[in-house]
Amino acid sequence: MKSFFYLPWWFFKARILGIKRPLQTVLFISDKCNLACRHCSVYRTTNPNIKSYHQIKEELEYSYRLGSRFVDLEGGEPTMWHDGDKDLNSLIRLSRKIGFYSATITTNAFMPFKDSEADSIWVSLDGLGQYHDDIRGKGVFERLVKNIEEAGHPRISVNMVINSRNYRSVEETIEFAQKNPHINAISLNFHNPYPGTEELFLDWDMRSEVIDLIIRKKKNGYPIMNSVSGLKLMKHPGSFK
């Protein structure tokens, strides 16, 4: 209920009064991960940074003071995080105690998360079957589907990062998200290459075709969270004047 009143007040202050405050915090709690994904550099880290409970508490309190009221806990793989007797659920409870209206986690779903106390859960899904496994590892897709089903969480959504190896799976992944009773929605983004991952870049012409496909699917009622205007802005910069 508090968020119902806070959102229009935040919008009024930002748009009318010109007071710029953050609304959401994305907090990376650890670089530790259990996969070696093609598009990610985290697994190459020999000494991953893992934030302490105290440090995370300070960062959450700081974000709250700035005006943020929604937090997304990410990694690495956040379900692996712990500090003594504190685990990921401890951070979710801490977020609520501080005053955040919602605490979300983003996971690769390789490990079970049926005991998660998060308000909502984002699962990284980079295509169906072999497409997902080609990027994240053999057998990972099967475990993802199993863990989503067994989680029994009412607010699970998936996010697909599109690249040159999985773009052919975009349409079937959108349809999978619609048909799966355990998934609420899907968000789609594109891989931004950095040194060592250039081969994953999807050329601008094909990217434009994929975006047009996503827009058609959205207009046909598929549960795609991206806005049409936002999708159009993902096209080649030269497409807009």
What are these regions (language model features)?
Residues 1-115:
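Conserved alpha-helical substructure of the radical SAM core
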Residues 85-89, 98, 119-120, 124-241:
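Radical SAM enzyme [4Fe-4S]-AdoMet core and its adjacent flexible, acidic
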